[in-house]
Amino acid sequence: MADASQATTPAAEGNPVPEVPETQTPPADVNGTTEQEQTEEGAEQALEDQPFVVTIVLPNTTETLDIPVSPMEQIHEIRQSIIEHPIAIEFSCFHLEFNGKKINDFIQVSDVEGLEHGAQLHLVEDPYTEKEARIHLIRIRELIGASGDRTDTVHGVLAGVSVHDDIVVENPDAPEAEIKEYDFQAPADLAILLPKETGPAPKSIKSISLSPWNPPPAYWRQKGHLLYLVIQTNEGEQHHVTAHVGGFFVNRCSNAKFDPLPKPAPKDCASHSLFTLLKKLSPSFEESFKKFQEFSSQKDPLATFQVGNTIPSAPWLVPSINSSLIAHEADNTRSQETYLLGGAENVDSLRDWNEEFQSAKELPKETIQDRVFRERLLAKLFADYTDAAARGAVLVARGEVAPLNPTEDKDAQIFVYNNIFFSFGADGVGTFTSEGGDEAARVATGKDVLGVKLVNQLDIDGLYTPGTVVIDYLGKRIVGQSIVPGIFKQPEAGENQIHYGAVDGKDIVAADERFAPSFEKLATALRVKKHAVWDKENKRHDLEASVEMKGLLGTDGRKYVLDLYRITPLDIAWMEESGPEGSEYPHRMTVLRPELVEALAKQKTREYVQAELLKRGIIKKPEEKKEGEEATEEAKTEEIKTEEAEKSEEPKAEETEKTEEASESTEVAEKKDEEAAKEDERIDISNFKFALNPDVFSGQVPQTEEEKAEMAQDEQDVRDACTYLRDSVIPALLNDLKESDISFPMDGRSLTRLLHRRGINMRYLGKLATLSEGTRVECFRQLCVREMIARAFKHVAAKYLRYLPLPLTSACLAHLLNCFLGFGLNSSPVAEVDEELRKVFSDADYSFEQVTPENLREAMQQEILHRFRFTLEDGWYNQLQHVQMLREVSQKLGVQIQNKKYAFVATEGEAEPVAEKPVAPAPAPVEDGNKKKKKKKAARETSPVAAAPVATVPHTFSPDDFVNVVPIVKDSTPRSALAEEALEAGRLSIYQNQKKLGEDLLLESLSLHEQIYGLVHPEVAQMYHTLSQLYYQLGQKDAAVELSRKAAIVAERTVGLDSSETVLNYLNLSLFLHQRGDSKEALLYARHALDLWKVIYGPDHPDTITTMNNYAVMLQSIKAYHESRRWFEESLRVCNKVFGEQTVHSATLLFQLAQALALDQDAKKAVDRMRESYNIFKTLLGPEDKNTKEAEHWLTQLTHNAVSVAKATKELQARRAKGSLGFSPRNATAGAAGIGSVVPSAVGVDNRNIDELVKFVENSEKKKGGKKSKGPSNPKKRGGKA
């Protein structure tokens, strides 16, 4: 089984590093310099870039601060390091001086003349401005723990939470018995998705907020007054404080009297820093602040750092609203934060997004320092914009932003908020009427943001894109774009607003030559062929890109590219295919994925090279060509994956050791081609071109015979691409899954990521499910079916939610989920709508109340038939895994639901409905809110048996269960090319046995990732994950453990507590800890990963086979042989269920189980299992195979040992009439109790053989580096050739 464990030990299989994509390999000769010169220059540059230490001299104290700095750093980074240091936390408004001269914050360290190791920089306090005073107040409040909880419309409840510290900290001294025991059949425990409740944090001060006297009147502003604050200390004293340009002082104000002058001595108190002032005002402040710091330091720092450059993950399951984890506390300053962050006029938060994007893009990128600064600025800018767009979209969806065209239809309305242009992802003006209307428009927006992301990643000089974000929220799709200068300008008579591409549909086509060079570069990178299109007058225009892609010359003189939803051709094979009756696809926007086009281009390139080699006679036709074809076939899928790994925005969490092996074989095949080419001059592939025409099959009508012939060829090329997808890519994926060459996806997200990497559109889920029927990938079929059902529910729910007011959405969601998942508890659910809300929203669409389980199923079945051309089997709704399906639909809709024991089926009497909330009859009488809550709570605590009337029949879900809905955001943020180049260079160096250089480059890549993205970001989590594997291969286990721990925490906070990436990171952490010797802690993390697996997938996921094997091996390392045996047995059960009994997988597991039984001193069963293993190996692999011979050798040894045990047993039975049972009965087979009764004697009878057996197993495990645990993933590897 492909699993995390395999990814951690590729070195054992002779694969030291993952494949380095050929595109990243540096040329041998750069700018005419030799390799030696480059090395010398690099060494000199490295010496110049060596970090050194400077001393910071602090004011008003004798303490100094030593800070390591790099010549590449900017001064403001040193400022940040000072602010974060414990002895300098009180400073925020200051500048640095060197030799008496002020240093500019935005220059590099190397630009400061004379600044070297040991130099002293003086920290000089600056006068405050109003903005600086506000920033200082916000920072001090957060620093001392005085800021309360924030209600966030975008991030959701408990956003960015981590449970890592609870896994071990919860019970650090747990007895080994608790670690060993595990209930394999227990249902998923959702409690593991919630952090443990802790007591309230110690308060260093009661409150600190803006005073009612704020803001200062004009007279006092002239005197330097900036803000007025009111502070209440733990001693119960209240102080009014003036924030002055020179610092903070206690004034004479009271709640009734305004007098902002300083208090006279001896009650006067003043300081430049508010933190220092608090120490003077409150005698207990320092002590309580220390306690607060100790409380905060209980968690890993990464678990508490602010999530900066990405939207934190919002868990789908959250605690009850009464939980202390989400308790809403009084905080006067919460409502003042808008002012504190944005100022009195709120101008601080108003930004010209488009100008910022394009100005950042135009920054120089000649040097490494330039690129670091540019990419860091872009990463921050994209993150800020995405966050602002998401917030604006939520307000638009809730109807809180006035439209610019209020008289238009709702779907056609447009909005501007916070300098971002918003529109709905619907066909409000009829643009997509011929393509499928609203459905086509919705898909086009998703494809557009993907196209913008690709263009941003390509980073073509002189070509600009607007900031683009797509937000799905409560059934609405909203597009947020930065405002391109001139986009709203009405064109002059005879002019077109669009300068390149289609204008007014396709009636007019513009082809401004100023756009041709930039579009040519873009087309080359995207594999788009230059082609002809015709306008309504049949006039020919030669375009570099799709006619749908538009070029606009902004009033700022920049060339903008818009409407990137058609960068690839249509999937004509899908459109022409006739599915089941009634399965007409809802739109014509069925484009191929860019990953597929790129993979096909690589395949065509390889075929071209092979043909050239054949033409030159370098390779022969029969044998060699056949082998080449095999290598090509082997490499097809991997090429897709390699290229997509470079372009995909998703973390590479599903990559495994088997994938890396496939990559290596691909690389070998490519190197053979290259070496062969060198024998007879280098093959010039510049003459080979592969590009597709994206406008075929879209209504273009060629005029001449030559044009018709060219169009026919273009159409054939696109058909070949469709054939490649269906006949090569999809079968290759299924074959890789069958052979366990890649990990099985765990849920909808990982399935989507896997298919997209391979270039497979999600509309092929039905085809994949059909092809998987009755094969060894049955669980893959089940996952495909689950994903289709979840997507169908999402689409049906969106239709009811789209035009519903926000307060009614909880009732709608509860009713739809009761019909979908709760019909087993109540087959006729009734929607519970608050009658007060019904009166308020009397014109709302209450059609969701008419939904029944039956018509909901029918609607979902139609969605699946239309979108996936797949027919669900009868009774599919009775086979649903309720928890897993609830998780899937919650994540797709952005729902955050309360944690409680949801009853999905009616039992004979009692427990499940206890947690449920009964539904009141409709219409229900209006009651006092508190009384209503009490009545509902009482009803939950009674048995459903007594609830005879319809009004008290329990429902699985009630509106109160839905805590929040968060927006689902798709952004266009590019990845850092610089950080990835350093990573690939480090991998390449290690692959070439330049370990020291490789490690330096890897550390440099890590530093770049952290600098550019910040510490808490999905890309950084992936970097930690990759680096932990590489360090493990290099034998640096401590570093591998630390990095994998960081990867797990950051993944939890950015991609989800129960994401597949998080599971993988915990499995790696477990394995690395075990290899380091911390098996007990390793077992805790492995158990957590398995518990997450149950929540995500349910029982019996194929990859858990390897994980259970690893767990068993860890148990053996702590001498828990009997418990280890149980894990091997469970692993074998799952393997037999997934792959069948007569397979190499099962034979390998039987081999390992036999060893475990021998260690558990169950000699007879050990012999039986080893014999089964031997017979399967012999049948499948032949008697001469190494696996077969090894199994035969062990069978002989175990048989000899069993005979000795049997003799000892007979002697004991003769001496004693009654044997004491040493262990509880094990497997229910004949003679088990007898064997159990003589375990103590067995050791004495054949002590030498058992000791050898233990030694053999443990040494084998150590020598193979965990190879034994990987058996199930590819058992052929155990003996080499299979």
Curated annotation (Swiss-Prot):
**Which compartments is it annotated to reside in?**
Cytoplasm
Family matches, as SUPFAM superfamilies: Hypothetical protein c14orf129, hspc210 (SSF103107), TPR-like (SSF48452)
Q: Would the keyword Ubl conjugation be found if you checked this record's keyword annotation?
A: no
Q: Gene Ontology terms, cellular component aspect?
A: cytoplasm
Q: Specify where the region named Disordered lies, as residue ranges.
A: 1-50, 624-680, 913-945, 1257-1282
State where composition is biased (Acidic residues).
Answer: 37-47
Tell me where on the tree of life, at the top rank, the source sits.
Eukaryota
Domain named Clu is located at 331-575
Question: Where do Basic residues bias regions lie?
Answer: 1264-1282
Major subcellular site: cytoplasm
What functional role does this protein have? mRNA-binding protein involved in proper cytoplasmic distribution of mitochondria.
Q: What is this protein called?
A: Clustered mitochondria protein homolog
Organism equals: Neurospora crassa (strain ATCC 24698 / 74-OR23-1A / CBS 708.71 / DSM 1257 / FGSC 987)
